[in-house]
Amino acid sequence: MSGTLVLVRHGQSDWNLKNLFTGWRDPDLTELGIEEAKAGGKALADYGIKFDIAFTSVLIRAQRTCQLVLDAVGQSSLETIRDQALNERDYGDLSGLNKDDARAKWGEEQVHIWRRSYDVPPPGGESLRDTGARVWPYYLTDILPRVLSGEKVLVAAHGNSLRSLVMVLDKLTKEQILKLNLATGVPMVYKLNADSTVASKEVLGDMSGAH
């Protein structure tokens, strides 16, 4: 019997609010981000799910989101595995810069290429392809076997690390994944078949406000 995989992007962080490239830097959630995470947890509580294990990154904004979701479903002490493989895309030299300042320094077109191309990394950083090259193997070795054994698994992570998973799960092209934005705090519930393909997907909230 296959299990359930739930993906949740962390709530708004301080640097999201300030329009900064975040990457592997470690800002906390804003008050809105906390409320977004709680809302995602409530949606999962209303859905009626109980998790067997949770996975998150080593960054505080994802860890706090994970804990707030678990609090909401009444599983505050659930085993949670933290791994760097689930970290956000590393923006390298862009990390910590205001996005407008980055455009002024390198030009709007170049920054757009770094942000929205699939395989062109910023200086010292990762492309979306590079991010997927660490996220997907970790999923295959550590997360997927738990789901295929019938467990209900929570993954609270980041926009680009989760897009790397969604790209394969939803069978999206490079062009499609570049246009996909995931809303903060909105759970995506996947039921998987025994062959690891997707049997069904439900989005518990509104993705229209994704950025």
UniProtKB/Swiss-Prot annotation:
InterPro entries: His_Pase_superF_clade-1, His_PPase_superfam, PG/BPGM_mutase_AS, Phosphogly_mut1. The record marks 158 as: Transition state stabilizer. Its EC number is 5.4.2.11. The active site is at residues 10, 88. Homodimer. Catalyzes the interconversion of 2-phosphoglycerate and 3-phosphoglycerate. This is 2,3-bisphosphoglycerate-dependent phosphoglycerate mutase. It comes from Rhizobium meliloti (strain 1021) (Ensifer meliloti). The lineage of its organism: Bacteria, Pseudomonadati, Pseudomonadota, Alphaproteobacteria, Hyphomicrobiales.
